[in-house]
Design a protein with these regions (language model features):
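Membrane-interface helix-loop junctions in multi-pass transport and translocation proteins
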Residues: 38-48, 150-154, 164-196, 366-369, ...
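Transmembrane helical elements of multi-pass membrane transporters/channels
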Residues: 14-31, 163, 186-194, 198, ...
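Membrane-interface junctions at transmembrane-helix termini in multi-pass inner-membrane proteins
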Residues: 135-159, 346-378, 417-421
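Hydrophobic transmembrane helix module of multi-pass membrane transport proteins
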Residues: 93-243
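Helix-loop junctions and terminal segments of transmembrane helices
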Residues: 64-79, 149, 207, 264, ...
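Alpha-helical transmembrane segments of multi-pass membrane transport and lipid-handling proteins
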Residues: 92-119, 169, 176, 275, ...
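Transmembrane alpha-helical segments of multi-pass transport proteins
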Residues: 28, 378, 427-478, 500-502
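N-terminal membrane topogenesis motif
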Residues: 1-30, 85-89, 122-124, 202, ...
Length: 502
């Protein structure tokens, strides 16, 4: 039992670091692309790219039926090879169907987008460039879900890096040669590159075959679609919350406040995604594979909470202290008024490390309506507290509202998981969170009330404390660093032996 726990710890740390590095490379590639595009195309070009990508995402998210998420759960449950082959074929069929649905919806919505979203100057033929982008995105997402569901994590990470680099290679020349006229061809080229990349890896695992019986495949995918639709609805509710908050700020405040709120939200969520990326990619399939075993399910959730908290806490302490510098790099000094909001958001991210592993339980167990219920209750509360916070204290108050909403979300998720799945949070998980929240909260007060050398001395001390705690616990539980050092020693010794034999 202890050996299995150590192995799980080592696996979580390994893949969190692995996919965190991948996410960091993706963020870096996006920054390079945005910088180059900003120089080549200017604000108008960036605005057009944003509008096109948002349109593609809106259509894709509402027509893919949540297959990219729900299929991971069903693939993870398949233990026998024939079952896996059938499920892979079913997922591919449903991906093609959602690709066709997305393409049709894209064509049907041309008048709507021309009138309300872009401008009447955009021709029907121009908008048709987005049709293959929507369809290829659905196919790509389906193939990627197959790799995730089969827990081919190395392939998932590798294709992500290759795709990020390939996207730069195929799009930047088009921007340079054609300017704004190259935006739509570049989007198609990027979609083709993404599809080719993921198919290169997925077809090596399972050659492309569709089900022999169309009717049976449609029936077999029913549960997958029901779970996926719940995920889509939850995503739509989340988008509705963000829209409602931004609309309230725009109407009761200023557009500048909306910009500050958006910048603060993006900075906080993007940074934390370096750790959270592994949740959907590695943790969700692993949890789905043991969803029928109550004890194993509880242990999996608790270990994920512990590792997420231990890995994220030192990063958040450092981020708290470096926030002014980060804002200057990513934006400009005009966005410094968002500092107060972001600081509250940073604390909320540690709570997110606790609630996300619990939220995946409903999806892993195939209980979509429980997931929808908890998300709906949270969304209503989030709108209320963020709006109230902004009304009382402006942008800083909106950040405080996000923190209160995160606390409420943790409580709701725990109550739901305890009631429906008999989840029991481990004392060790509570202890680790309690120990790591202290330096993070202390770093908040240091960043707000201290300046100059005192701020840096105290900040570095708090970071060192948090990092030391995390390292000690992770090394004790996983022995990962010892294993890495021993591996290098073995390679070094083998190299010496080979040299001596010569």
């Amino acid at each position: 039992m202890k050996e299995n726990a150590d192995r799980q710890y080592r696996q979580i740390v390994k893949y969190t670091g692995y996919f965190g590095g991948v996410q960091g490379l993706n963020i870096l590639a996006a920054l390079v692309r945005n910088k180059v595009v900003a120089v080549l195309l200017g604000p108008i070009g960036l605005g057009l790219i944003s509008l096109y990508n948002t349109a593609v995402k809106l259509i894709g998210d509402t027509t893919n039926l949540g297959i990219p998420v729900s299929s991971v759960r069903y693939l993870s449950e398949c233990q026998e090879e024939p079952d896996r082959c059938r499920m892979v074929a079913t997922v591919r069929l449903w991906s093609l169907l959602t690709a066709a649905l997305g393409a049709v919806v894209c064509c049907v919505l041309v008048p709507f987008f021309r009138l309300f979203y872009f401008s009447t100057e955009m021709s029907f033929a121009e908008f048709l460039w987005l049709v293959p982008v929507v369809a290829l995105t659905a196919v790509t997402a389906g193939e990627l879900s197959i790799l995730k569901g089969l827990q081919r994590m190395r392939e998932v990470a590798t294709q992500s890096v290759v795709n990020a680099m390939l996207s730069l290679v195929v799009t930047l020349p088009l921007f340079w040669l054609l300017g704004n006229e190259g935006i739509l061809p570049a989007l198609v080229a990027a979609a083709v590159a993404a599809s080719v990349t993921v198919l290169w890896f997925s077809l090596r695992v399972y050659p492309y075959r569709l089900p022999h019986s169309f009717r049976h495949a449609i029936s077999a995918g029913g549960g997958m679609v029901r779970l996926g639709v719940a995920f889509v609805i939850a995503g739509a509710m989340g988008s509705g919350v963000e829209f409602a908050v931004r609309a309230f700020i725009a109407n009761s405040g200023t557009l500048a406040d909306v910009g500050l709120y958006n910048a603060g939200y993006v900075v906080t969520v993007t940074y934390a995604s370096i750790v959270f990326m592994s949740m959907e990619t590695e943790y969700f399939p692993r949890l789905s594979a043991v969803n029928h075993d109550e004890e194993a399910c509880n242990a999996t959730v608790n270990r994920q909470i512990e590792v997420s908290v231990l890995l994220l806490a030192p990063l958040l302490v450092a981020f708290m202290l470096l926030l002014p510098f980060v804002i200057h790099v990513l934006y400009s000094s005009m966005f410094l008024p968002a500092l107060g909001m972001i600081r509250f958001g940073v604390v909320a991210m540690l709570l997110r490390a606790v609630m996300l592993p619990m939220e995946y339980m409903s999806l892993a167990k195939g209980r979509p309506w429980i997931y929808l219920l908890t998300e709906g209750v949270y969304d209503i509360a989030a709108v209320g507290v963020v709006v109230a916070g902004y009304s009382l204290w402006g942008i800083d108050g909106a950040g405080a509202g996000l923190l209160v909403a995160a606390v409420f979300n943790c409580v709701i998720d725990f109550v739901a998981c305890r009631h429906y799945y008999r989840y029991r949070i481990a004392k060790k998980s509570v202890k680790m969170f309690s120990v790591q929240i202290l330096p993070l909260v202390a770093s908040y007060f240091v960043s707000v009330f201290c300046t100059g050398a005192l701020q840096w001395v105290l900040g570095v001390a708090l970071f060192g404390m948090s990092a030391a705690i995390s390292y000690r616990v992770l090394e004790r539980e996983s022995g990962l660093m010892t294993a890495i050092i021993n591996k290098f020693k073995r390679k070094h010794d083998e190299g010496i032996d080979s040299d001596s034999s010569l």
